[in-house]
Design a protein with these regions (language model features):
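Active-site neighborhood of glycoside hydrolase catalytic domains
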Residues: 1-54, 160
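Substrate-binding clefts and catalytic carboxylate motifs of secreted carbohydrate-active enzymes
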Residues: 27-30, 39-42, 46-52, 66-186
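Low-complexity repetitive segments in secreted/extracellular proteins
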Residues: 56-58
């Protein structure tokens, strides 16, 4: 099922986590807690990786124009309740780095949106368009923000979206939990 994660041109012949998920972890769980059942998680459980009806999902796949959720954008708060997952083992929302981190790697150069050093450290176009769209939709007009304001509002927006998605997962009567993936590191 792990092959569902990769487009055809880059599908690996083997996914190297297989031994950990199917041999090492089950033995470790059984040795330390013989009465606790072990169930491998995505991508090694179920008929296909990210199958929402069984096992866990990486909820990133539900962002975009997914047929079940009808998300239009990654930042559409009102669609989070429609994620059909029992457990999300990975999800998140793009966020900019903290200003102290940005200033550290800029090493005295000017903090500007078009600074190539800033872009090199993770401010790529798709990430920026998601952040900008979320700020525009939920907080203020992105175009009115300077670099400092962008970093501040990006963090606020990321926190709001994480909170909303965590609450949406928590409200499910059959929900078993979720794990947030931080996506604002270098």
């Amino acid at each position: 099922s792990y092959t569902d994660w990769f487009p055809a041109p880059i599908k690996p012949e083997r996914f190297y986590g297989e031994k950990i998920f199917n041999y090492i972890q089950p033995r470790a769980v059984h040795r330390n807690s013989p009465l606790v059942p072990y169930m491998p998680s995505s991508p090694y459980f179920g008929d296909r990786a990210n199958e929402s009806e069984q096992g866990d999902v990486h909820a990133w796949s539900f962002f975009g124009r997914h047929p079940k959720t009808k998300f239009k954008f990654v930042y559409e708060l009102e669609a989070f309740d429609r994620i059909p997952a029992r457990f999300s083992s990975e999800y998140g929302f793009f966020g900019a780095q903290m200003e102290s981190t940005v200033r550290r790697y800029l090493d005295g150069t000017e903090m500007r949106f078009d600074n190539p050093i800033w872009k090199h450290h993770g401010e790529f176009d798709r990430k920026r368009s998601n952040i900008d769209g979320a700020i525009d939709r939920h907080l203020t007009e992105f175009k009115t923000l300077d670099e400092h304001g962008y970093l501040l509002y990006s963090g606020i927006m990321q926190g709001l979206l994480y909170a909303e998605l965590a609450e949406a997962m928590r409200r499910k009567p059959y929900g078993a939990g979720d794990l947030i993936w931080m996506y604002n590191d270098c």
